[in-house]
């Protein structure tokens, strides 16, 4: 009941083609393939890094970074805004 039959896959493929168009699908598939290759190579590199022990005897302490000046100039509050007098014209009777 939960398995996808071939008809379900055909309908899904048709909906994808309708939504994205046939011109964008090859580019999307190519980009996905490149991303997967990069991901696999990074995973393999991480596994190789974990298998080779890091040199522990010659670890250097991280260099001390200069501290940036964090003082700020005092901020003066803006002057209060005075309400403008409203000019009303006398109503003619």
UniProtKB/Swiss-Prot annotation:
Keyword Coiled coil among record annotations: no
Location of this chain's protein in the cell: Cell membrane
Span list, region Disordered: 44-93
Superkingdom, taxonomy of origin: Bacteria
Pfam families: TatA_B_E
Residues spanning the membrane: 1-21
Subunit structure of this chain's protein: The Tat system comprises two distinct complexes: a TatABC complex, containing multiple copies of TatA, TatB and TatC subunits, and a separate TatA complex, containing only TatA subunits. Substrates initially bind to the TatABC complex, which probably triggers association of the separate TatA complex to form the active translocon.
HAMAP family linked to this entry: TatA_E
Identification of the protein by name: Sec-independent protein translocase protein TatA
UniProt source species: Rhodococcus opacus (strain B4)
């Amino acid at each position: 009941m939960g398995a996808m039959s071939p008809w379900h896959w055909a309908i899904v493929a048709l909906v994808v083609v309708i939504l994205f168009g046939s011109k964008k699908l090859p580019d999307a598939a190519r980009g996905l393939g490149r991303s997967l290759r990069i991901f696999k190579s990074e995973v393999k590199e991480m596994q190789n890094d974990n298998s080779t022990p890091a040199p522990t005897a010659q670890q250097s302490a991280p260099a001390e970074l200069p501290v940036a000046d964090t003082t700020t100039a005092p901020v003066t509050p803006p002057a209060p805004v005075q309400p403008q007098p409203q000019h009303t014209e006398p109503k003619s009777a």
